[in-house]
Amino acid sequence: MEGSPAGPIEQKEARWESSWEEQPDWTLGCLSPESQFRIPGLPGCILSFQLKVCFLPVMWLFILLSLALISDAMVMDEKVKRSFVLDTASAICNYNAHYKNHPKYWCRGYFRDYCNIIAFSPNSTNHVALRDTGNQLIVTMSCLTKEDTGWYWCGIQRDFARDDMDFTELIVTDDKGTLANDFWSGKDLSGNKTRSCKAPKVVRKADRSRTSILIICILITGLGIISVISHLTKRRRSQRNRRVGNTLKPFSRVLTPKEMAPTEQM
């Protein structure tokens, strides 16, 4: 009836309808058909949706950071390289362009954490030349010796992570014919022939010192042999003189007149 006061049931249904109209549209998917008519609001569903919205960006950020830390930013072209004495050796270290402005280096050692850094890019030495192209670090070693045989690493310095590194093993031999790779045929990466490699001054000084020491040892050995031979010859001569002296002593004794008389009577 119009104008009659609403009963308890009518008031309860009116409250449900008003609370249902106040719910936002994005909560409709969280409510089951039964709950849409029985429960005016579900704070737990709203909270779970908010947690999902906040968790997704954090999860994606964690995945990106993990990929950045775990992925190989530096990759060596070959794990084993061969060359020969007084020739050049080159290595190409490919890296992600993201690390273009990061310092790169070339180091030597079996363990990556204890390798000795030889040179930083773009600096070079008389023995090692580094060239950074933006996505490759090209290392060229010249005037190789057998002492250069060992393990080498390309490295990228990173501020908030461990340095990314990759290794190669260099084997230097004397025989040029044993090389099977044209990459080590005495040409650099640009195709030009490398300059003739001469032994460094330090090596020359070492060779001269070795030869001088060898000559001194030979002279000392010769003098020792000569002195021993002369000593033996003198000893033999003295022994011969003693033997001759002992044989001549009985005949060199002077005879007295009494001893000479019997000999004359005979």
UniProtKB/Swiss-Prot annotation:
Specify where it is mainly localized.
Answer: membrane
Q: Would the keyword Membrane be found if you checked this record's keyword annotation?
A: yes
Q: Where is this region: Disordered?
A: 1-20
GO MF: transmembrane signaling receptor activity
Task: Identify the InterPro entries for this entry.
Answer: CD300_family_receptors, Ig-like_dom_sf, Ig-like_fold
The UniProt entry lists membrane topology as:
Multi-pass membrane protein
Cell compartment(s), UniProt? Membrane
Regions that span the bilayer: 55-75, 213-233
In this protein, the residues bearing a glycan are N192
Please tell me one Gene Ontology term that the record gives under cellular component: membrane
The record's Gene Ontology biological-process terms are: activation of adenylate cyclase activity; immune response-activating signaling pathway; inflammatory response; negative regulation of cell migration; negative regulation of cell population proliferation; negative regulation of NF-kappaB transcription factor activity; regulation of heart contraction; response to wounding
- What name has this protein been given in UniProt? Transmembrane domain-containing protein TMIGD3
What species is given as this protein's source? Homo sapiens (Human)
User: Which gene is transcribed and translated to give this protein?
Assistant: TMIGD3
